[in-house]
Every structure is written in C-alpha cells, then in structure tokens.
C-alpha cells in the first residue's frame, strides 16, 4: 500500500493508529469494575504535562491498523469496547463504531472533547483539559464528566466545566496519580461539601492490571 492510499484510508477512518488493545477491568468512573475491551489509539496534541501515556502522542509511531482487524479482536473478547488514547476524536470514529454496532458491541469513548464528535456512542466520558478546551457541542452529549485534579486550581476548572454539561451527566473528580497522596484528602473533603461530585480512582493501578 502506497502512502497516498494509506493516508486516504486513515482520513476515512478505515485505518487507525493502534497503540495497543487489551481486555481488562475498567478502572475509572461510572463503569469501574466492569469488563471491557480497550482500544488505545495514537495521536494527541492536548499535551497534558502529567499524562501517563505520552508515548501515545505521536500517531506515526503506531501502526495503521484496519478497523476490521481491530473489531475482530473485540468480538473475540467482549461485548463492550472503550476507545481511548491519545485523543481518539482526532480520527473519524464513524466507520469503526458502525462496524462495532453491526456486531452488537456497546461503544464507549474517553475523550478530551477537543475535536468534533464523530461516531455512534453508548457512553461518552468527557475529560476536559485546560491546554485545549472541548468544543462546545460535545458538552451536551457527555454521559460522564471526569475531571483530573492535579492542584487546587483544577477544582475551579472542574466547577466551571460542570456548568456546561447536562443535568443528567455524572460528575467525577479523579486525583492525578502522581499527586494522589496530596490531593486525595482535598478531593474527599470537597466531595463531602459538594455532593453533586463523586470520587473516581484509578483502581486498575491499585490492582496492577492494564
């Protein structure tokens, strides 16, 4: 396949830069504790300094993979898929979610919301970042708002973002892993005073699973 053909297939969402895929237990937010197949796509320009998967940022370092091959692996393992990154909405998600739907797979996405929403989703976890704010139209679509808390200023940012989502959207505060011992007491106290929020933990890291 020549580079022009490959680029055309990537632009159409028929090839995606696959960093990794694995079957595991979801560790964060509303669906924590439930089994799901994860698809981690390469490519992200949001640039969070505390990102724990910076190797995902450069999409060119990850193989362009057919969505048919990706979905085939999903079908063998689970009836629920979580597409994450990187920032998956850098790519057209419509073809892969169509194929997943045709195979009765529930579709979840984890996104910063910095790019236009594409694809057909059962669950949208929106995790806004200060470096590159979400586009306005995605807020009303979010089922879950997950705010990563690195310092006290992030609580102000979280409150501001919570005003933009629908009243049915679930609200979570999650400590940034490297600062968890410092910020967890702050988050716990904040949630007790502001019970519209819930605490999210990266339980997969405590369990030492992917």
What positions do the PLM features span?
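Conserved AdoMet/S-adenosylmethionine-binding subsite of the radical SAM
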Residues: 89-210
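Conserved Radical SAM active-site core
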Residues: 3-4, 12, 16-23, 35-38, ...
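Intrinsically disordered, low-complexity peptide-like regions
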Residues: 2-3, 141
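A short beta-strand-turn-helix
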Residues: 26-29
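A generic structural micro-feature
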Residues: 31-33, 139
